[in-house]
Amino acid sequence: MIRFPTILIAATAWLASFVAAHAQAPKVRPTVWISPPGQEKGRAFRDLFERPDDWKETRAMVDVLFATDLGFQRNYSDEELTRWFGQMRDWNLKFAMEVGAIKEWGKTGAECFAKEQPYWQRLQKAGAKIYAIAMDEPLVCTREHIHESDEYAVEETANYVAQVRQHFPEMLVGDIEAYPSSSVEEHEHWIETLNKRLADKGVRGLDFYRLDVDWLRFNAQGKGSWKDLRELERWCRQKKLPFQLIYWASGYPAASKRGLADDSTWYTAIMQQGYDYALIDGKPDAYVIESWIGAPSQCLPDNGEWTFTRSVRDFARKFVKHDQ
């Protein structure tokens, strides 16, 4: 017969080990990814390396620096890239890219990968350790540009991911898709269907999911909401799929057409998006600050008025909480 004291001692020991294990488990902190505007043949990206002292404070808050693979191919020499990747190692910055998986210039996953693989190999030869790639909206491209079915998008995206996993097995692979042009339910269905197809192929599923939110449409068109988006974040977390959110100046193009946009528009817009999502307790796993709209006009310094790195610095100070 087991005596009561023995049971009590065993229970106490189990509880102590349970508490200790959870106390020792480190919290996964949110990360900051940045991609500066690409105008003037990627001048802003080049400035980050040629003027490193002008963004030291911001750099300490950044985890991942990225741009498009095509931008690296077009704009920068091998000598520049070799030097920059060395600097990134010294700064403990990870390197990532946005890439095509289904595009008008590559309508199948195999075709896209065949065109991009030489770009990536060139970067690796220059010293890059490619941490992650994010596929640039294959579902959107399939629907809106090559006019194929969602089933086609699933199959060709899965084919692309399979190629990446085979040739670059250590690389994280995520997907970017648009909201609110696709509903929350459509996003959930897309993720589940794509991951199931990958599983059927014996290929690891998505490593993260990134939302490109045209949040101006929430009020201008009454389509979508931060509340609904927060539900997608929760759903991803339940699926143990890291959720990333792009922060950008959604209203900049419309303001520019009306002669209302300047560099302050970028800054105030991403801060507004930060407040809007934080005020409903939105907490993405990665805060992705990215400009593809040619603004702001200056990347540096990070204490300058309305510069890109200033916006990153102030945003990260305000919204990126490492205890979340």
Show the residue positions of the predicted features:
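An active-site-proximal structural segment forming one wall of the substrate-binding cleft
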Residues: G109-M135, Y152-R165, H189-G202, W266-I280
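Aromatic-lined substrate-binding rim segments of carbohydrate-active enzymes
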Residues: P52-W55, D63-K103, A110-K115, H145-V173, ...
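Aromatic-lined carbohydrate-recognition surfaces of secreted/lumenal glycan-active proteins
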Residues: R29-Q39, A96-E104, H167-I191, L206, ...
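Active-site groove signature of glycoside hydrolases
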Residues: W120-D150, G174-P180, R204-F218, D285-I293
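C-terminal segment of classical bacterial N-terminal signal peptides
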Residues: W14-H22
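Boundary/entry segment of secreted carbohydrate-active catalytic domains
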Residues: Q24-Q73, A101
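Substrate-binding cleft of secreted/luminal carbohydrate-active enzymes
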Residues: V213-L216, Q244-Q324
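Bacterial N-terminal signal peptides that target proteins for export
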Residues: M1-L8
